[in-house]
Regions:
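C-terminal and inter-domain tail/linker signature
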Residues: 1-148
Length: 148
């Protein structure tokens, strides 16, 4: 894949994210991840493994933050090097649904969040992510939604 192809793949992946589950673009979000993708979240927890599991956690995220939006047109930063992309964008949303944290369910707070969100993705030659590393201020996010 050339640099421009990777930048377009990343941008349209985030377009699909912004459209959300149930939209005609959601299949793009799913197919941009390999069947055995590893998704690393902030906080050091073991990665989410597999497209299906990542899809399930994404759908749950939309239940908690149904109006979430990643500002990717334009990104704050977007570049490609080798088979990697790196994007930095503003991420916004409102906690309108319950949040599942382990065995706990936290009721919605109705509070909004705004954080910088960074994705470092490793792509295969077929245009799908094999490894995705996500970075954002977890403590700041929790404080903004009234949980910190």
């Amino acid at each position: 894949m050339n640099r421009q192809d990777l930048l377009e793949l990343m941008t349209t992946l985030d377009d699909a994210w912004n459209a959300g589950p149930g939209s005609s673009l959601w299949e793009t979000f799913r197919k941009r991840h390999t069947e055995d993708v590893a998704v690393y979240w902030p906080g050091g927890a073991p990665p989410t493994r597999g497209r299906r599991n990542h899809d399930l956690e994404a759908v749950e995220f939309f239940k908690t933050f149904p109006d979430n939006h990643l500002i990717n047109r334009p990104y704050k930063i977007l570049f490609a090097d080798g088979n990697h992309t790196c994007s930095v964008a503003e991420f916004r949303g409102t906690m309108k649904g319950p949040m599942k944290l382990g065995d706990q369910v936290i009721p919605p707070t109705g509070k909004s969040l705004r954080v910088e969100f960074c994705t470092v993705a490793t792509w295969n030659d077929q245009g799908a992510i094999t490894e995705e590393r996500l970075f954002y201020d977890q403590v700041g996010l929790m404080k903004q939604i009234g949980l910190g």
